[in-house]
Amino acid sequence: MDEGMELKGCVCRIKSCAGQLLSMEEDLVTDLDDDSWDLVWRDLRLKETFLYIDLSRVISRSENDERRKALTLLANKFFYCTDELGDAVTSRSVPVVKMCYNDTAQALRELLAALAPPQ
């Protein structure tokens, strides 16, 4: 497979998962029943897994060492926030989920901005 095409696919999946995560806010800030909390947690973990794989590929193929380091730091911050969000969803505390979701969304926006091609 063409490496450039693979990276384009990774970036496309990253943007798609990011859009889905950013649109989950309403699902996360309302009081849900037990089954819904479990589904939200599973969906969050699934998206996190896809993002981990694709971000790993994009970062490892980054030609600029500074860019690689910056993306790694932002990705680590994002995954830390998603872990915190996952714990908050498990606790089923809406106020904690709101706070963790906001942190996760901010970290994701920073990561997406850094992924944009340099101009």
Regions found by a protein language model. Name each.
Residues D2-I59:
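Alpha-helical segments in soluble extracytoplasmic regions
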Residues D38-L46, R68-N76, P95-T104:
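Short, charged, amphipathic alpha-helical segments
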Residues Y80-Q119:
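C-terminal amphipathic alpha-helix
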Residues R13-S16, Q20-T30, L74-A88, C100-D103:
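Solvent-exposed, amphipathic alpha-helical segments
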Residues K47-S91:
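Long, amphipathic, charge-rich alpha-helical segments that form helical bundles/coiled-coils
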